[in-house]
Amino acid sequence: MFNNLTQRLSDSLKKILNKGRLTEENIKETIREVRKALLEADVALSVIKKFIENVKKKSIGHEINKSLTPGQEFIKIVKHELIFAMGEKNHSLNFSIEPPAVILVVGLQGSGKTTSLAKLGKWIKNKYKKKILITSTDTYRAAAIEQLKILSDQIEIDFFESDKHHTPIEITKNAIKYAKLKLYDVLLIDTAGRLHIDKKMMNEIQQIQVISKAIETLLIVDSMMGQDAINMAKIFNNDLLISGIILTKTDGDSRSGIALSMRYITGKPIKFIGTGEKIISLEPFHPERIADRILGMNDIMSLIEDIEEKVDQSQIQKLTKKLKKGHDFNLNDFLTQIKQMKKIGGLNYFANKFSINHQLSNNISLLNTDKNTLKKIEAMICSMTPKERIKPIIIKGSRKRRIALGSGTQIQDVNKLLKNFDDIRRIMKKIKTDGIAKVIRGIKNMLPKKF
């Protein structure tokens, strides 16, 4: 989502970074470039105007911090204004109410509302260990309730099934009564979406909001909608007590202007962003980290948190102990690492987190290892016998043909896998003897290239 803006801003700021001193002339020239980058990213005009005013005011005639170069000082100002536009801090969910804490999810049909509710339930369950109940008041779309029930089963969260003949108001009342009776901590309510905003829809949600005494009402916004999403958010914000926003489909080719505009226009914080189709692809919105990502400083903290949450640490410790004892790294170990990688989202996930360094990402082939490649690798290893996985050296002609046939791949793919595995095994051996500093030089060839 931020790649294009990152590229444009990087090009603009690069020119001023190495300047010996800042003058009004070179500041204005850079600001013009920054303004153009923000316009292309579809940032709202009112936001751009305020952003540029603040940057100009703080940089022209501003006293330079002695520990920074003039260029670094200017970038620091730009970063501060990016953070200010997006909301300065992360706003967590509010649970400070007598249970159940009711969270409403509202938005247009097709915005990813129902899926986002399930993702949110999964996130709350993992983060806070709360007892959660999910229900749907969308009686207008035949498949809506069934879709949410299926998602609830997937994330192992209880679902309150309503009578299809009941009204959304009746469903809300019954769900709250049941949640209190069964001592649930949180009740997540999915409301009906529409293809466009209408008065009936708003009146219904307003009633649900009042009856449920919702402590959070989260607006789901499709980032692919651009300026239309901002106009839609204004209407929802005027008619409802919106507490925050979840921005969906940020892993696509959407322009990043919506992330920079939404809080400034509505006055409400972006609380989460949807980063993919998987049920775990939801992360809290941290303005400072996003600003770092936009400016090419890389989102290290989000990456670490994701790895800690999604990767099985016991498997890593197990492999480390095994290598320390002198055992060989085999294809069973490799398969375990591939499965861990898939949990995070494949190597393209890392490419997105570090997409700012374009020269680096273009040169490192491992960043092109996508989900399909990981699936192929897994299929090939699963088509091997236990002996072949432990001693891949025995895999010759006829065995390669059998593995390719069993995994639906080509013999060339099996050859590539074995070669890449051999490279990895050599690096694993080096870890024991040379230490990590020398090993790091071989990392770019460590993982399989795209088939």
Curated annotation (Swiss-Prot):
Subcellular location: Cytoplasm
Pfam hit, one: SRP54
Entry-linked CDD domains: SRP_G
Cellular component per GO, a single term: signal recognition particle
Keywords: Cytoplasm, GTP-binding, Hydrolase, Nucleotide-binding, Ribonucleoprotein, RNA-binding, Signal recognition particle
Record GO biological process: SRP-dependent cotranslational protein targeting to membrane
Main location: cytoplasm
Catalysed reactions, semicolon-separated: GTP + H2O = GDP + phosphate + H(+)
One Gene Ontology MF term: ATP hydrolysis activity
EC number: 3.6.5.4
Transmembrane segments: none
Binding residues for GTP: 107-114, 190-194, 248-251
NCBIfam families: ffh
Family in the record: Belongs to the GTP-binding SRP family. SRP54 subfamily.
Task performed by this protein: Involved in targeting and insertion of nascent membrane proteins into the cytoplasmic membrane. Binds to the hydrophobic signal sequence of the ribosome-nascent chain (RNC) as it emerges from the ribosomes. The SRP-RNC complex is then targeted to the cytoplasmic membrane where it interacts with the SRP receptor FtsY. Interaction with FtsY leads to the transfer of the RNC complex to the Sec translocase for insertion into the membrane, the hydrolysis of GTP by both Ffh and FtsY, and the dissociation of the SRP-FtsY complex into the individual components.
Designated name of the protein: Signal recognition particle protein
Annotated source species: Buchnera aphidicola subsp. Acyrthosiphon pisum (strain APS) (Acyrthosiphon pisum symbiotic bacterium)
